[in-house]
Structure formats: structure tokens, C-alpha cells
A protein has these predicted regions:
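Conserved small/polar residues in nucleotide/adenosyl-binding loops
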Residues: 1-2, 6-16, 384-389
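Zinc-dependent metallohydrolase catalytic domains
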Residues: 24, 159-290, 299-386
Length: 389
């Protein structure tokens, strides 16, 4: 009976969640609502949250899916308190399986690893063991990583390379024949305001408030760290966004562009071969990490990022005619990728991958332009054709 209720609830929730394509539309997701929907209040779910937050009530909330909240409002009354508790217990156990005993981990992998993700084997034990330190104490681990693997010279080179790529993107904006001067002006303002984070944060996170007790279980200590993180986030309510805060650890092999703060971040983890090598030529570095940086910069002007202004606010700064021209060009790119057969009978979803496809093309173009404008390109182009360069 419990399992049937859990599966039934998941199926109902699944049918009320926006499709992935719709979730790519910022204006469709950002809906300011007042108060908490009635059913949540009727089940006394709001009070403990409000008490923990230290505020009397939610005056406004940015709801990513109002449709989902409306569904919850109508669905909760159909469940008993016992069914709601069973669902929440299952959710906690499922989320905690990674720090529980092997039988919980194995059961979780059978479902979410094999069935949902198609994996054949779980990650090795050492890698799973590093998950919690990397997430809960990410910057502490990152500080150790940076001291050993990321010299200051790497950061200096990268900051210069990023500025060259910023100039190159500015050139491409100027060269757009379909964009008006008014919209180009705002695009340049946004590009100039772009915050760049390279390698590691200037100020490391202070974890001294996390209380680790060796006498307690692994699970209890993980929960204690989670409580600290939650309270740390509560303290940010009602305060200006700290744009110096990092949202990716230094040892992470990845990068990001955040439209809501208009920033790009390249942790030390990705600034190593094959992406970056201080001893390599400019041609190699522009062709590797340069393309990645150009990709992330372009996200600021793709089908999602273009809806945010220089400050990260959701504002339409495009002239209507420019927006219409952009959409027509984007539709053509979407159609092109819809025809890509990724497996027999399986085609790419050009609408869902549109942002990445735009960023990939932008990254290549920007990196090439930046390299050709660099001093090193003159000598390199003597050895290769213009296409090879």
C-alpha cells in the first residue's frame, strides 16, 4: 500500500512538471507569487519553515512552476497525514542512501543508477567516499588542491586570455548585420559588466561553524553539516547578493555562466591538460580552454541568457525587431539540430539543446578571433593555412 501510494504520487507529480523545453524560458519560470498556497498551510507545513527562517511570513516568492504549486494545493487534501509522512520519510531515506549502509546504496543504484541512468556499475568506493568532503567541505578541499596544483602564474595567464576573448566577443557583436545599434549598446554594457572568476575565490569559506563529532555516526555528521549549510543560506535572506561567493568548488572539472549574476567561473580543476597548459602554445590554449571560455561567454546572449541584463535582472533589453530576428535565426539552428540522428531512429531535440548549440558555435568563433588577434598567431599562421589556424 505504501509503495503504491509513493509511485502514484510520483506519477502525478511528473505529469504536472513543466517540460524541459518550457523550463528553458526564463519569463515562463519566473513567477512572483504572494503567500503560500492553501493546502500547504492547512497541513501546517508553512509554520516550521517560517519559524526557522525567522520571518513572520513569505511576502513574495519567485515560483519556478506556478502550475505545480496549484497542483500541490489541490492534491494534498486527497492524501492522509500518514501518506504525506510516508512520502517524506521515503524522500529523506532516498536522498540519504549515499551515506547509509551498502544495502541502501545498492538499492538506490539499482533504481537511479541502472534503470534511470543506464549505468552498469556504481562508481568506485574511493570516488563515492570523496563526494561528501567535496560537497560539504568543498572550498577547504579546494584550498589544498590549489596550493599543490594551481600556481599564481596560471591565474595571471588565464585572466589575460579571458580579456582577449571578451574583446573578441565585442567584435562579433559589432559585426552582427541584423542587430540594431541600440541593442548592440546594451550588449556591450552587459559584456563589460561580466564578472570573471578564475581558479579559486579571493576569500575562502569559513567552515568553523560545522560541528563534527567523531562519536556520532557518519549520517549524523552529514546531517549536522547540512543544517549548517541551510542556516548559512537563511542568513542571506533579505541581503544583497554576494557576487564574490563561488557556486563551484576550485577542484571541479567544469565551468559555468550564471545569468542571474552575469558571471563566468572557471575553477582550477578544469585549468589543466588537455584544456589548459601554461607550457603549451597560445594556439593550443585558445583552441582548448579558449573555446570553453567563449562558450560560457556566449551563454550570456543565447536563448536564455539574452533575457537577463548586465546586472543579472530578468529584463527585456532588446528592441522588438532585434528579438524577432534572433528568434528566426535560432529557429533555423533548432531545425538543423533536429535532423541530427544521434542513434538509429533517435534524433536530437534542437529546442532543448538550443542554448548549448548557440554557445558551441559562439565559443569556436570567439576563440579563433581572439587567437588571430594575439601576438602569437602571427608566427603560427606562417606554419599553417588560415583554416588550420
Amino acid at each position: 500500500e505504501i509503495s503504491e501510494c509513493l509511485v502514484g504520487s510520483e506519477m502525478c507529480i511528473r505529469d504536472r512538471v513543466y517540460a524541459a523545453e518550457r523550463r528553458r524560458k526564463p519569463f515562463a519560470k519566473a513567477q512572483v507569487c504572494t503567500g503560500i498556497v492553501g493546502a500547504i498551510d492547512r497541513h501546517n507545513l508553512e509554520r516550521p519553515v517560517v519559524k526557522r527562517l525567522g520571518v513572520e511570513k513569505f511576502a513574495q516568492a519567485n515560483v519556478g512552476s506556478p502550475r505545480f504549486m496549484e497542483f500541490i494545493d489541490s492534491y494534498l487534501p486527497s492524501l492522509t497525514d500518514r501518506q504525506i509522512k510516508d512520502y517524506l520519510i521515503y524522500d529523506v531515506v532516498s536522498d540519504s542512501s549515499g551515506v547509509l549502509s551498502e544495502d541502501f546504496q545498492d538499492a538506490n543504484f539499482e533504481m537511479f543508477g541502472k534503470v534511470m541512468s543506464g549505468k552498469e556499475e556504481p562508481e568506485p568506493r574511493w570516488k563515492r567516499a570523496m563526494t561528501i568532503p567535496n560537497s560539504m567541505l568543498g572550498e577547504a578541499v579546494g584550498e589544498l588542491y590549489v596550493k599543490k596544483y594551481f600556481p599564481d602564474s596560471n591565474k595571471t595567464y588565464m585572466l589575460n586570455l579571458v580579456e582577449n576573448l571578451r574583446k573578441a566577443l565585442g567584435k562579433h557583436i559589432d559585426a552582427l548585420p541584423w542587430m540594431s545599434d541600440a541593442t548592440k549598446m546594451h550588449a556591450h554594457e552587459k559584456l563589460a559588466a561580466l564578472t570573471v572568476k578564475i581558479g579559486y575565490p579571493d576569500k575562502w569559506k569559513d567552515y568553523s561553524g560545522i560541528e563534527i563529532d567523531p562519536a556520532k555516526s557518519y549520517l549524523e555528521n552529514v546531517y549536522q553539516a547540512s543544517i549548517w549549510y541551510t542556516q548559512d543560506n537563511y542568513k542571506k535572506l533579505g541581503k544583497p547578493v554576494d557576487k564574490q561567493e563561488w557556486h563551484m568548488t576550485p577542484q571541479t572539472v567544469n565551468a559555468y555562466y550564471s545569468p542571474s549574476v552575469n558571471e563566468i567561473c572557471f575553477p582550477a580543476g578544469i585549468l589543466q591538460p588537455p584544456y589548459f597548459d601554461l607550457t603549451a602554445s597560445d594556439a593550443q590554449n585558445y583552441g582548448a580552454i579558449g573555446v570553453v571560455i567563449g562558450h560560457e561567454m556566449t551563454h550570456g546572449f543565447d536563448d536564455q541568457g539574452r533575457h537577463f541584463d548586465m546586472h543579472g535582472n530578468l529584463v527585456d533589453w532588446w528592441l522588438p525587431e532585434d528579438s524577432e530576428r534572433f528568434t528566426k535565426l535560432a529557429d533555423r539552428l533548432e531545425t538543423q539540430f533536429n535532423e541530427v540522428e544521434v542513434a538509429p531512429g533517435v534524433f536530437a531535440n534542437g529546442k532543448f539543446t538550443l542554448g548549448e548549440n548557440i554557445a558551441d558555435q559562439g565559443g569556436l568563433r570567439i576563440a579563433l578571433t581572439a587567437f588571430l588577434d594575439s601576438r602569437d598567431s602571427v608566427q603560427t599562421c606562417l606554419l599553417y593555412t588560415s583554416d588550420a589556424a
